[in-house]
Amino acid sequence: MTQKVIVIVGPTAVGKTALSIDIAKKYKGQIISGDSMQVYRNLDIGTAKITPDEMGDIKHYMIDILQVQQRFSVADFIDNCRKDIKEIANDDNIPIIVGGTGFYLQALLDGYSLGGDTFDQLSIERRKKWQLFMEKNGKEKLWEELAKLDIVAARKIPINNFRRVIRALEVIEQTGRLFSEQHDESNEEFEPLLIGLNTQRSTLYERINKRVDIMIQTGLIEEAKYLYNLGGATLPAGKGIGYKEFYPYFDGEISKDEAIELVKRNSRRYAKRQLTWFRNKMNVVWFDLVNNPEDIKKIYKLIDDWI
């Protein structure tokens, strides 16, 4: 039996946190952070971590679970998510995953089998190969590749369900057997509804710049100095945007204003990469609540139909 999961994605500063709270209240949900940096304690400002006041009485998971010296891999993310989703569902609540690292979310939803280094290398390489093939040749050509290898499986998978087509190709390569002859457990694990938030680029970049200014006012530089004093970029948590840009400033190599501009530039670039990832690799239904707040009704309708 598949577990329904709502996933809210999109770049920073477009309202994902507020939407997640609204959905959790309306549909009896609990929230899992999908951000690989929000797992770290004492990194609240630079990670745009939800505040206790914003949480209200909605339970949140995968926030403040590690020290900055501890590593957090995609395998750790999947393990934690699966446990949290199970706990939420067992309490008759809907799991809601918010924001996050695109590859981590995709790995969870596409049902990677965890197996240490083998998982990290071979599975990722197979997946990336077929993703690149699709980006270059299109969904139809991708589906045709599956049809050449396993026509029975291809007839059962719609062309537009490229995630499933890629999964089938990956399994065939991994096992050397037809996908249609195998019991693929990932197919039964999750039934995600992917909701994406975005807005026009000029507005998005303006909101990102403003958010960085607010972060500076509320203590981002002090947070970066905390990481710097512990080891900076040598720490698992020390390479995040919003922190690493200040290390040259602390070393006297650039000015504070230059560091702040680097944070803004890197944040904008990351937002662009996020959008490219989610659009190319995940089946997301997009909304712009910044310019069209009334679209919240369309989101509720989408959820009602999905439930």
Curated annotation (Swiss-Prot):
UniProt xrefs under SUPFAM superfamilies: P-loop containing nucleoside triphosphate hydrolases (SSF52540)
Residues bound to ATP: 10-17
What's the protein name?
A: tRNA dimethylallyltransferase
Task: Please list the coiled coil stretches.
Answer: none
Question: In which residues is substrate bound?
Answer: 12-17
Similarity comment: Belongs to the IPP transferase family.
Top-level EC class: transferase
List every stretch annotated Interaction with substrate tRNA.
35-38
Query: Quick one: which gene encodes this?
Result: miaA
Main function: Catalyzes the transfer of a dimethylallyl group onto the adenine at position 37 in tRNAs that read codons beginning with uridine, leading to the formation of N6-(dimethylallyl)adenosine (i(6)A).
Q: Which InterPro entries match?
A: Dimethylallyltransferase (IPR039657), IPT (IPR018022), P-loop_NTPase (IPR027417)
Q: Which cofactor does it need?
A: Mg(2+)
Subunit-level organization: Monomer.
What GO MF terms are annotated?
A: ATP binding; tRNA dimethylallyltransferase activity
From which source organism is this entry?
A: Ligilactobacillus salivarius (strain UCC118) (Lactobacillus salivarius)
What biological-process GO terms show up in the record?
A: tRNA modification
UniProt keyword list: ATP-binding, Magnesium, Nucleotide-binding, Transferase, tRNA processing
Q: What is its EC number?
A: 2.5.1.75
Pfam families, per the entry: IPPT
Q: Where is this site: Interaction with substrate tRNA?
A: 101, 127
Which reaction equation describes what this protein catalyses? adenosine(37) in tRNA + dimethylallyl diphosphate = N(6)-dimethylallyladenosine(37) in tRNA + diphosphate
For whether the record's keyword set contains Lipoprotein, the answer is: no
